[in-house]
Amino acid sequence: MSNSKEIPSFRWTQSLRRGLSEFTTPVKTDVLRDAKMILDGLDFNQVSLVQRILRKSKRNDGDLDKLRDLNKEVDNLMSMKSSQRDTILKLGDLNKSELMDLASDLEKLKRKVGQTERSASGGVYLGNLSQSQLTKRSDLLRKLGFQQQQVRSPGVVRIWDVADPNRLNNQFGSVPALTIACMTKQSDNTMGDVVQALTSLGLLYTVKFPNLIDLEKLTAEHDCLQIVTKDESGLNISGYNYSLSAAVKAGATLLDGGNMLETIRITPDNFSQIIKTTLSIKKKEGMFVDEKPGNRNPYENLLYKICLSGEGWPYIGSRSQIKGRSWENTTVDLSTKPQQGPRTPEKAGQNIRLSHLTELQESVVREAMGKIDPTLTTWIDIEGTSNDPVELALYQPDTGNYILCYRKPHDEKGFKNGSRHSHGMLLKDLESAQPGLLSYVIGLLPQNMVLTTQGSDDIRRLVDTHGRKDLKIVDIKLASEQARKFEEPIWSDFGHLCKKHNGVIVPKKKKDKDIPQSSEPHCALLDCLMFQSAIAGQPPQTKLEGLLPDALLFTLEAAFTI
């Protein structure tokens, strides 16, 4: 597509909002909580100092140190932040066409950003030569017939004369909580006044891009908006400046609806699905990366932000502690690896969310799955629904080997209902479940393997979702009372293996009150043991051995919420 084509920026923005609406979340409470923390905890003398630094025409390493130190203080005060999580997208996360499309756009974006940053310097030297060396260099170039490029730049050209330009990365994006706190403090208004004013800008943003004329009209109603600068926002100066774009972004976070892109939250579980959805919207709307230097269009802006970090709030969270750029932190691996069974991505619209394991983790899982003998009876059971499983168990009674893994649910409402009446698992215990592990295990099941289960419908749907239609499912179809005949001895002997079922079970009301109802939670592994015991007429006699190490089941950084 020609880069000269006019870009319908707001139409693209609206299309992205609609298409990515399922990933947006209400953030007003979180933003205001962080704003209050910043307002109460930040030294605003240092804020004023940094704002003066940002107004200087030339800034050095000492100035950058002050900016970075203040950014770190802000980051420490905030709960909404992006984490350093480098991501390698592979076949299975996206299809080959999508991976190639993403790789191409990231490369174009890299060139565009590089050219924009170079042109923004206005031809002014950004390195660390001394002034005398620069003068001598200019004289030498003039003698050799090179004419100095005449650069037209609106206003003052502000540059960073620093030894390591990489230290500038991720230090300048506006953060709504910081914008609200600074406006409250420095405009001498209440936070309530600031919130009302920014909300008006946010509401306007749902139908158009607010401009300076709109700002002037709104300022007549909201005095605190006088602090918003009328100057065009420049590159690498917006962190603590009251630009219109920073105010609009803050306003977007204060709305209860609107599917604002600013409220997207990325997790390791939904990252690949967000990328997939974005590429689909791009194709439908004819979006593209325009490599000409200049401001990013809505698609470019979204792509840059979501690829910078695989976890957090890409638009509005603190990201000053992230190292690297988008094309460095999100990379594409087009190589294919032989697998024990076919592993294909989920179908559009389904809730299975594939994520990524490290090379070492994949190696450990492959080694464990290599001990599953496809010629032996293999029980399989899950907790949760087929399109949103939270626990998977495989059990081979002949050897005692078992696989047990977990997954954070996508449908929290459905999960809580299942927790209350069935499995008793708690959301807080699954927050740090290793992303992608459950799906990877299913993908590694040997080709054409036979799996034994009590009730086959959900298992059939689960393996089909993962592209494993080759797997054979045998349903033993025991009566409910017969299937749970050994429930008490199984829980007595093996309950210590069931560590994530700590909720209280409330039995559902049934028409037949003569049938006793169990108050024990359903555990995928223990259910497999019960079903096998019902067939064998006795509890397992072979010592059980878990094939996956506990350290692999959950990530090291446990989830923490306030």
UniProtKB/Swiss-Prot annotation:
The record marks 458 as: Important for exonuclease activity. Mn(2+) binds at residues 381, 383, 527. GO terms for molecular function: hydrolase activity; metal ion binding; RNA binding. Residues 54-237 are annotated as: Binding site for the cap structure m7GTP. It is found in: Virion; Host cytoplasm. One of its GO terms (biological process) is negative stranded viral RNA replication. Signal peptide: none annotated. Its EC number is 3.1.13.-. Keywords: Capsid protein, Helical capsid protein, Host cytoplasm, Host-virus interaction, Hydrolase, Inhibition of host IKBKE by virus, Inhibition of host innate immune response by virus, Inhibition of host RLR pathway by virus, Interferon antiviral system evasion, Manganese, Metal-binding, Ribonucleoprotein, RNA-binding, Viral immunoevasion, Viral nucleoprotein, Virion, Zinc. Encapsidates the genome, protecting it from nucleases. The encapsidated genomic RNA is termed the nucleocapsid (NC). Serves as template for viral transcription and replication. The increased presence of protein N in host cell does not seem to trigger the switch from transcription to replication as observed in other negative strain RNA viruses. This is Nucleoprotein. The lineage of its organism: Viruses, Riboviria, Orthornavirae, Negarnaviricota, Polyploviricotina.
